[in-house]
């Protein structure tokens, strides 16, 4: 008997490659519609006359044991004769990666064969199908349940007949749809965007008595290692086997050398159990708790207290860290964002290494989880390789500061007597663990308040006394004051939580700041990033100021990558000023799992006493802990670096070959063999200086917040060229203010009410506009244009424009936008004089021309102002009746005294 099978193509989205197994990409196949008894002979061929497909057509003879199955590759249109010794069900794989094509496969079956019962969901009554299957001599049947296709083996026939197929359909489809949603995949029949899902995808389920383990997810199907489907027919929120194996379809690259194999997919499993279960079931039945939450929390507590390397934690201990990461509001957006980032990366350039996983999660989150990660012993790397194959600084903490991220931390470390059952303070939001992560805003409801003293330890209190400080929860300022005359900060009525402290950083001296609990008090998450933990009961803090003299941008560093995928492993800082070498280890696996071969070794030798210090990284390092390893180094010490793999150690801009290289620590720089100190160190510092200035340009909010990077840039610029003003805009306020001009144009209307404020700060490339709420208009006596503001870029295009007739109502607005050198400002005021004022650095400029038209051009640091059009691309008119002009001279507005704004 003859059969023809038309095989469609599986169109891949741009982020998915042929040969990759994610999201069931190679699971689709079409049944021939028969069951072949053992030793049945048949002929098969593929029709290659249809142009387009370029790969062999694959026919599979499937049953319930891989050892008795067969794969047949059809490479041409010639008939192939086949005889198979075992009962089987023939299928033809879809053509993966092809577009606008399909294959036709012909079968000629000589011997007896049995029709395969097939059910396509919702196309006929289920009972009709079950009746057909029950009466059929076939032990096999095949189900199309939308997002899952299932080859049911003889051993599961009775079980399937007892199953509610509608519930089975809902079970599988809800799992896969939810996993798709967690990863941010979007249905798209054209599959041509970075977030496109796989069109017409479906998981293929079968039995495999010869399979590994208890069950597995493979490139072509997922299966229990059994002759029957077992749990694959069990509909239950506790069916961990099924939700676990389906989760493997979404591992992507997140399990490669990350110690997250069998963790990443299970974090999705935990999320669907979180969705399915109520509060009681979540505690009793969820796999992460299993009615033993207090005991599991105690295990985590012991691991933290003992500083156990996270990579050595148990399977479910590592998993539960993701439970608490994803529990908060917007926690799941972290998962969606990191998946989107992966797809962007895979679409652009799959050869560029992915970021270290903890950095990747940190930069994908809406909240700041860095302190939480440090608590459990993982350290996000602060560097990554961008799409141009260049090592780039993340600046994780400054990025979080610029984005106004709130800091999440386990509630048990904030309210130290909190207990989910016995003392939960009647908190309204759902919490399921004493380790759930909270922010200060969520703890206001507790009405717990503290008065906290921050003791400032500084060599020169005059640098900070009387200076303002503030405490922030994300973008919200919750407290502000000034440093008291005793040199301390006093926080009054602050609730529990982790805040960001914006502390004064000195005046004409620069400091590095370190924040921690006072001595002998419970351990504070000590840090240099101003994360302030206010506990209940509360404890005082110590803020230590250490003089900052030599910029970190003058410190050379090396970047160590993994052997196979170039994952980020460590940063090595060579600091000749402090005479230290510091290794920041971010990944304890540099190569093959469980391999103890030497990967990297650093030997520091003291030339004066002959002593040496050694730091070693093996391919796998289960006894090492992520974090910082610091070594003291004297001048003229030799630093021998030994690499087992070429091209995996980057020092400055040089990629080391395999073998040994020896560096020498000189007074102001570290040099390779046969090189001597020269001016190249300044050139490297200048290059880093410009990179970090560009970072501040991208995160311009940091230009208005005192922070360590601005200190670092100031110190580096003084080292490179003290006379240059190239980086003045990035300086700390104390050094920048004398160069800063703030221009405020104030428009007034009838009754001298303020209509509009236009403020321009050329040095910061900033313009802001505040528009008042004047319902009757600026001046009801005028029915013509009363005032106008217009800014244009260097090409004459309008950047901002606003105008009103005298009787035209005004509603409140606030605008903030960037302006640059060469931009022009055109102002019109129907009644000039006192109705239009210019205030420079809070001082009224009395020399502003008293004309209806005012023109100005923005320069790097100032405004050039006049009452006539200014040459060099300035637009000459606002196109209104402006009255007479007196041809006033153009002048530069200057100020004799700087007043901070």
From Swiss-Prot:
Keyword Glycoprotein belongs to the record: yes
Keywords recorded for this protein, A-Z: Glycoprotein, Late protein
Highest taxon of the lineage: Viruses
Positions annotated as glycosylated: 65, 265, 339, 349, 540, 594-595, 642, 683, 698
Record bears the keyword Glycoprotein: yes
Species of the source: Trichoplusia ni granulosis virus
Encoding gene, per UniProt annotation: VEF
InterPro entries (alphabetical): Mucin-bd, Peptidase_M60_dom
Task performed by this protein: Involved in disruption of the peritrophic membrane and fusion of nucleocapsids with midgut cells.
Protein name according to UniProt: Viral-enhancing factor
Domain Peptidase M60: from-to ranges: 27-330
